[in-house]
Amino acid sequence: EVRADGAATLILLRKRYEPAAGVPLPAPVVGNEADVPADMWMDIEGARLQTLIPDDVAYDIAMNVFTFAPGYSLPIVETHVMEHGLYFLQGKGLYYLDEEWMEVEATDFIWMGPFVPQSFYATGTTPSKYLYYKNVNREIPL
């Protein structure tokens, strides 16, 4: 049962679980994002990361929340071998994707293919926050 004191948004991600040989099934994860610590990311005071799913080989997906203070950014342009996506929760920013900067804001969704260069810069006057997911702990079919 899920209850909310006010308006709520449900984000549903459907993904078939990929078992790993000799690894038991993961335990269900239920919680509230507000109860997950926001740890400083890469020693950058204005960048915080909340890890929503345990970093354990039993889980085949990572789901995290990044929060950036205005003016802070990912310090690198990165690529990943796996596809992944993000849902923008609050604030505004510029997202760099495949050689193009685009403005993003709350309720925007971005799907990123494998090996696509990407980065993020928080704009506006309030913190920017996004939920992202990616496949982890399994071989990526190439």
Functional labels for PLM-detected ranges:
Residues 1-20, 114-140:
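Ligand-binding loop in jelly-roll beta-barrel domains
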Residues 7-61:
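A short, N-terminal "cap"/entry segment at the start of jelly-roll beta-barrel domains
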Residues 38-77, 83, 133-136:
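A short glycine-rich, His/Asp/Glu-containing loop-to-beta-strand
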Residues 65, 101-103, 117:
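Well-ordered beta-strand positions in beta-sheet-rich domains
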